[in-house]
Amino acid sequence: MSNIIKALEEEQMKSGLPKFAPGDTVVVQVKVKEGDRERLQAFEGVVIAIRNRGLHSAFTVRKISNGEGVERTFQTHSPIVDSIEVKRRGAVRRAKLYYLRERSGKSARIKEKLAKK
């Protein structure tokens, strides 16, 4: 029984998604339906959490919009998510960056991870 479920879930999972981690700045292209037409909307921010559960995987992106913090959780394999692009890699030592919610300005910055030689 579980093999059937696993096979169905693997069939629905997206392939070709980039590797990203908490602290990375990503641009998520989201399909937005307005009336009868569909368009793409970009949501750029810092990944503050990732939940790895196979088909039910999700990640949370935080950005500052007009001085107000905005967080949005995306299902990784959702048909609403069109593409994910990693803009920069962040060097962090935590899996969940919820402490960024209380910070603003320079204290909310994340150092950039330098490429290994």
Curated annotation (Swiss-Prot):
The gene is rplS. Belongs to the bacterial ribosomal protein bL19 family. This protein is located at the 30S-50S ribosomal subunit interface and may play a role in the structure and function of the aminoacyl-tRNA binding site. It comes from Vibrio parahaemolyticus serotype O3:K6 (strain RIMD 2210633). It holds the Pfam family Ribosomal_L19. GO terms for biological process: translation. The lineage of its organism: Bacteria, Pseudomonadati, Pseudomonadota, Gammaproteobacteria, Vibrionales. GO terms for cellular component: cytosolic large ribosomal subunit. Keywords: Ribonucleoprotein, Ribosomal protein. This is Large ribosomal subunit protein bL19. GO terms for molecular function: structural constituent of ribosome. PROSITE patterns: RIBOSOMAL_L19. SUPFAM superfamilies: Translation proteins SH3-like domain (SSF50104). InterPro entries: Ribosomal_bL19, Ribosomal_bL19_CS, Ribosomal_bL19_sf, Translation_prot_SH3-like_sf.
